[in-house]
Amino acid sequence: MNYAFTNGKILDGTKDMQVQTGLCILVQDGTITDIVPDTTDLAGYKTIDLQGRYIMPGLINMHVHLAGNGKPQKKQRDNEKLVKKIMRSSLTRAIAYKMVSGFAKDELLSGVTTIRTVGGLGSFDTRLRDEIAA
């Protein structure tokens, strides 16, 4: 499916970026193929009017622990002991995986489309990656 995003405020992510208007973002099969003037003929594209909303590339988070929500801990805890306790039972593993999936969704809803995990529970991060890719 081809989409044309119109009437948006574009932030392109460059160092000295300025809001750009009067442009249209063309997407073919999930890939941005061009950014053209909004006067361009959009035949063959499903038009999505952004109604003046902002649009920008996905953010990248290069240091993620999906087993945590990113909030500061109120008290010190023994993470190694906690991980062993969580991984011991299929029920607690299932609960932990659901939490990890939720934290990944929080990243996505915050505009982060790419993450690099640097430690987590078992193989939860690769399992989640594979489920998303399927």
Language-model-derived ranges and their functions:
Residues 134:
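A metal-dependent hydrolase metal-coordination microenvironment
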Residues 2, 45, 113:
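Conserved acidic residues
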Residues 13, 35, 50, 62-64:
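Generic detector of well-ordered alpha-helical packing
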Residues 54-131:
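Metal-associated gating/positioning segment near the N- to mid-region
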Residues 1-42, 55:
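N-terminal metal-binding scaffold of metallo-dependent hydrolase/deaminase domains
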Residues 43-49:
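Short, well-ordered secondary-structure micro-motifs within conserved domains or adaptor modules
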Residues 5, 27, 49-50, 61:
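Short, acidic, Ser/Thr-enriched surface-loop or helix-capping motifs
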Residues 12, 47, 101-103:
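A generic local structural motif
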